[in-house]
Amino acid sequence: MNRLHTLIDGFSRVRILCIGDVMLDKFLYGSVSRISPEAPVPIMKMDRETHMLGGAGNVVSNLCALGCRTTFISVVGDDDHGRQVRRFLEETHCVPELVVREGYETTVKIRFVAGKHHLLRADQEQPLNMEPELASRFLERVDACLPEADLVLLSDYGKGLFDGRTAPDVIARCRAARKPVIVDPKGADYSRYRGATDRKS
């Protein structure tokens, strides 16, 4: 037990820069007692609704819960969901370095749950295009935050943040700064992560 306490206490000394796709998770809870007369689908009576960080935002929440000093870089839309993501990140006591892109909708995953049954998931999302101007602003954040980090974590959820040159450019900066970079990848093509210190299998 003392060893575990020592390990957990050590987390508070680690400064982690997490970079990844953030999203908002919504859970709609209710009960089903009948089938719709309009179509053979259940009618759910809504009881309550909860919101939380999803994607790489959930990773950040877990790191902060362990006591890690965490800075988080991602892209959100100039919308209510993006502002809600920022508030949730601030509540975890991480440092949110969010790049806001006008015209982009922050990704939201909506899950409908009745009792123990997950009835449906609805996604509100659009592809994130890391065009040159956005990529430049994003990499400026990376350059500004990198010197203070002990470790860099790339959390790829396949929403466009690491498409194109983004992942190689970030990894090159980490290597130049001699910062270890760990990748939690998405998909089967790992070539974009070449040069990373390690990756989750």
Tell where the protein language model's regions lie, with residue ranges:
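Glycine-rich N-terminal loop/short-helix segment of MobA-like nucleotidyltransferase
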Residues: S36-P37
